[in-house]
């Protein structure tokens, strides 16, 4: 089912940063600087040199991520389509511009397996973001823009409060399609065309 797509006004915060001229500009980091930071279970990203750290995810966020991962992993493995990956996993979208993200889930096809090296360096075919009440990193529109700009083919936005899944399709690095799934509608994918899973199963309701 197609429908209008709505983003939260702000999906999260950048700790300690405010839009105030009196606040000092954050220190910019390189990709190498980022990889030297101590490991943490909290979501992190490097947004054009600015380190962003969010709160640890809530239990219901992790529940939705787990349900999706198990279903997608079984689908992908049975058909030998590629590999599913689970956050925290750094995705280097742009080394020179210092842009690193950590989507909740990502699918990398056999055709793109070359991007998995010492790190994942390049765009996955599919990324999944579970949007939760807890503070997330940055704004949804911003992150979706990065995914499209750097070659992600499809992005799922699972909104737990509104109980809906938005599936965004990209082509030629532009947003080409928006589909909205609600209630008992099975969520489908152009990247994984035989996959189907109801929102109830994702959210465990």
Per-region residue spans from a language model:
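Gly/Pro/Ser/Thr-rich low-complexity, intrinsically disordered segments predominantly at protein N-termini
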Residues: 1-205
């Amino acid at each position: 089912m197609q429908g209008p797509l709505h983003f939260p006004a702000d999906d999260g915060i950048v700790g300690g940063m405010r839009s105030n001229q009196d606040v000092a500009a954050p220190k910019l980091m390189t990709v190498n600087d980022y990889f030297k930071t101590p490991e943490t279970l909290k979501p992190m990203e490097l947004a054009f040199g600015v380190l962003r750290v969010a709160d640890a995810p809530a239990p219901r966020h992790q529940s939705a991520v787990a349900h999706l991962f198990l279903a997608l992993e079984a689908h992908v493995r049975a058909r030998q389509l590629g590999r599913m990956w689970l956050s925290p996993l750094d995705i280097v979208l742009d080394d020179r511009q210092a842009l690193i993200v950590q989507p909740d889930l990502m699918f990398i096809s056999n055709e793109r397996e070359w991007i998995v090296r010492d790190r994942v360096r390049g765009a996955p075919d599919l990324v999944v973001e579970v949007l939760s009440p807890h503070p997330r990193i940055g704004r949804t529109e911003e992150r979706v823009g990065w995914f499209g700009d750097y070659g992600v083919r499809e992005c799922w936005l699972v909104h737990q409060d509104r109980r809906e899944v938005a599936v965004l399709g990209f082509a030629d690095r532009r947003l080409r399609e928006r589909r909205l799934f609600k209630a008992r509608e099975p969520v489908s994918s152009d990247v994984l065309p035989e996959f189907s899973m109801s929102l109830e199963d994702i959210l465990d309701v």
